[in-house]
């Protein structure tokens, strides 16, 4: 790995740690933050571990039949492990942000929801194998999912997501990746 890439990765890691510390400190003063841990798999033997910091500004609109719409902001740092033998770079990091729109039940011990969002991502490496490249470090991440928020104080959340990551044909080739993910979240 070149010194330039190592320096770039070190800067990204420091930025992710600084963001995590800043959000962690803010969470000590508000009940609108959460920590999310997810795991997923994609085609071509790609596995993913994802750490997310979630901010809920408390916005609600369109109350319909005991449900309402809301939006949360998610900040992600993820690690990809490529198990394919021909992997050019078996370890890839992904950093990004996504606004997530939810349609969630208004009240109850268990509050089911559906969600969708489109965000941006930056990858540390774009070449997955010699014949498959993401072409650009800048990617879009769109996802849809289902889940539930639960607990006496709504501190817990679990869900399943389908996530597609690609560069939207900014540059070709653009094979994209489709992840199936499960996640758990603790809300402060």
Regions found by a protein language model. Name each.
Residues 80-116:
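Helix-adjacent hinge/juxtasegments
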Residues 54-58, 100-104, 147-149, 185-187:
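Transmembrane beta-barrel domains of outer membrane proteins
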Residues 35-41, 73-79, 114-120, 160-164:
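Transmembrane beta-barrel strands of outer-membrane/channel proteins
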Residues 1-30:
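Cleavable N-terminal export/targeting peptides
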Residues 49-53, 176-188:
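Outer-membrane beta-barrel "beta-signal"
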Residues 37-39, 84-89, 128-134, 167-172:
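Extracellular loop and loop/strand-boundary signature of outer-membrane beta-barrel proteins
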Residues 42-50, 88-94, 135-139, 173-177:
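Transmembrane beta-barrel outer-membrane domains
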């Amino acid at each position: 790995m070149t010194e330039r890439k190592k320096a770039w990765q070190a800067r990204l890691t420091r930025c992710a740690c600084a963001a995590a510390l800043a959000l962690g400190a803010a969470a000590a003063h508000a009940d609108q933050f959460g920590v999310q841990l997810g795991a997923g798999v994609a085609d071509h033997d790609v596995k993913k571990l994802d750490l997310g910091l979630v901010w809920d500004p408390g916005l609600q609109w369109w109350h319909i039949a005991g449900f309402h719409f809301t939006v949360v902001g998610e900040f992600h740092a993820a690690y990809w492990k490529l198990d394919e033998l021909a992997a050019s770079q078996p370890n890839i990091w992904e950093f990004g942000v996504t606004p997530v729109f939810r349609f969630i039940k208004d009240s109850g011990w268990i509050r089911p929801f559906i969600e969708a969002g489109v965000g941006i991502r930056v990858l540390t490496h774009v070449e997955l194998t010699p014949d498959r490249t993401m072409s650009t470090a800048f990617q879009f991440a769109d996802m849809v999912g289902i889940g539930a928020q639960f607990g006496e104080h709504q501190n817990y959340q679990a869900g399943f997501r389908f996530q597609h990551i690609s560069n939207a044909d900014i540059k070709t080739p653009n094979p994209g990746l489709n992840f199936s993910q499960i996640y758990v979240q603790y809300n402060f």
